[in-house]
Amino acid sequence: IVCHLIFAFVVPATGSRLIAYITIIVLGVSFALVPAALWPSVPKIIEERVLGSAYSLIFWVQNIGLCLVPLLIGSVLDSSNAANPAVVAAKAEIEQLKAQGVQAPDVFIPYNYTVPLVIFACFGVAALLLALYLKALDKKKHYGLELPNIKK
């Protein structure tokens, strides 16, 4: 959540590459730790007889997200930058070059990514709320989510 908000607000305001590098490293470590914490909890919550179905459902939801979230972000990026003069000018330059029969060079389109990054932060908030719910459920039903899998 914090990383996406830093990318949305702090990095554009400061222009600091150091902050951007540190933020992307923290985000990468976070992405690596989530599966390490998530996958071992599944067999503690789900009955063994339906464990395979549970894993397939998890993969299905992840793949739907991988399919639909880029479409959502692309649509939001286009609509939130429709009135951005720099984006409009860059797109007009590309269209003008195409109309002249010239292959458009790699023209930098200066999109404002604030809204998509806030959406990612909202996904993070939703995940945090689900994690807190799971922790409360663990406390109530004693799944042992924070206990080691290997017992001595």
Language-model regions: role of each:
Residues 33-47:
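Intracellular juxtamembrane helix-capping segments at the cytosolic ends
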Residues 49-82:
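A late C-terminal transmembrane helix in Major Facilitator Superfamily
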Residues 17-33:
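Hydrophobic core of transmembrane alpha-helices in multi-pass small-molecule transporters
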Residues 1-14:
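C-terminal ends and interior cores of transmembrane alpha-helices
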Residues 104-105, 109-152:
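Multi-pass alpha-helical transporter architecture, strongest
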